[in-house]
């Protein structure tokens, strides 16, 4: 995690240095004007129009020790999307208040403001409606769990509905514990939240929350292109009604560790990839679609299904083949919790 801290006065610098302790596990940048900077501070350039944009793009958290007005003016040209914008906090130079200014839920600014306020002995000033009314914040929950939000427009409608009453909630996975305020278990209704890897929409307005619990196992012909792999996987997902964002990792046999097309596909889609030895794949328990030809070439009767099942609990989609690519999908064991 990366944090950038800005201070504008001598007292602000002292307060920022105290606040730096809260970000001790972060890559930390601290900036102040020449007239007040000291210690660990770098120069805050007075006439660089790209400076704040560069920090906005680099950091996960921006902390302005000063006024909200300063922060708003500096970040305004760079605000793009609540799914990707960093958390922006403002703390006054006396450390009396901490305000989460941007990305309160998905970026974690509300949580960070509460933590920083406790660390500094300050008061967190949280203004998001679900928080002040003690209702379920689905986008904050999804971000905390590392789940994808299917559609931000639906998320906005769900959040508005939660403020007016309870919304429906259903899941492909076992739900453990008590549901938070604002949601009730129902499989139908005008507005609802669906947690799963499929593209189902059980409600009139469905917010799909997608956990990355699918393992994609891949086997392929030597020299296969990334585009061919992309097309094979997209077809596999479409035919089985599965969401690509549910893929959490890709696996294959060790001899494919230098397969340029496979590596390019994984890089393009930001999928972590693991390669397994023949012995590791043969040790995977289960019943697989056996091929004597594949065994004669690789020493393993099935690469894609076995690779998909490493670390997973159930084989969801068996081996499919398209244009020199074989692929299978397996799912991890998962429970939905709210703690």
Describe every region a protein language model picked out.
Residues 1-5:
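Extreme N-terminal starter segment of soluble prokaryotic enzymes
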Residues 11-28, 32-36, 42-46, 55-57, ...:
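Conserved mixed alpha/beta catalytic, RNA-binding, or beta-rich assembly cores of soluble enzyme
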Residues 7-9:
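Glycine-rich adenosine-cofactor-binding loop
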Residues 48-50:
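A short, well-structured juxtamembrane/interface segment
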Residues 245-246, 251-306, 312-315, 319-325, ...:
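C-terminal non-catalytic interaction/assembly regions of soluble proteins
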Residues 16, 307-308:
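Long alpha-helical scaffolds
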């Amino acid at each position: 995690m990366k944090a950038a801290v800005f201070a504008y006065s001598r007292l602000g610098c002292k307060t920022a240095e105290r606040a730096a302790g809260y970000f001790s596990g972060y890559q930390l940048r601290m900036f102040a004007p020449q007239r007040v900077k000291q210690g660990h501070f770098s120069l805050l350039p007075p006439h660089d129009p790209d400076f704040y944009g560069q920090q906005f793009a680099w950091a996960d958290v921006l902390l302005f020790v000063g006024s909200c007005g300063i922060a708003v003016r500096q970040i305004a040209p760079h605000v793009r999307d609540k799914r990707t914008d960093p958390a922006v906090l403002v703390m006054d130079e006396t450390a009396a208040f901490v305000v989460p200014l941007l990305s309160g839920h998905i970026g974690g600014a509300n949580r960070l403001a509460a933590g920083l306020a406790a660390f500094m002995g300050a008061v967190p000033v949280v203004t998001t409606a679900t928080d002040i009314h003690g209702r379920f914040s689905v986008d904050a929950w999804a971000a905390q769990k590392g789940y994808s939000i299917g559609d931000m427009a639906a998320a906005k409608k769900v959040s508005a509905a939660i403020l007016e009453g309870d919304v429906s909630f259903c899941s492909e996975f076992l739900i453990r514990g008590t549901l938070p305020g604002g949601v009730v278990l129902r499989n139908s209704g005008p507005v609802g939240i669906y947690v799963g890897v499929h593209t189902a929409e059980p409600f009139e307005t469905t917010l799909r929350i997608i956990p990355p619990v699918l393992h994609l196992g891949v086997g392929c012909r030597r020299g296969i292109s990334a585009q061919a792999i992309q097309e094979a996987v997209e077809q596999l997902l479409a035919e089985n009604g599965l969401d690509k964002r549910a893929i959490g990792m890709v696996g294959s046999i060790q001899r494919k560790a230098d397969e340029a097309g496979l590596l390019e596909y994984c890089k393009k889609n930001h999928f972590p990839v693991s390669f397994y030895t023949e012995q590791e794949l043969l040790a995977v328990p289960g019943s697989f679609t056996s091929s004597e030809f594949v065994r004669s070439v690789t020493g393993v009767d099935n690469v894609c299904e076995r690779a998909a099942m490493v670390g997973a609990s159930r084989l969801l989609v068996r081996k499919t083949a398209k244009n020199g690519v074989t692929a299978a999908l397996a799912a991890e064991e998962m429970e939905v919790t709210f703690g």
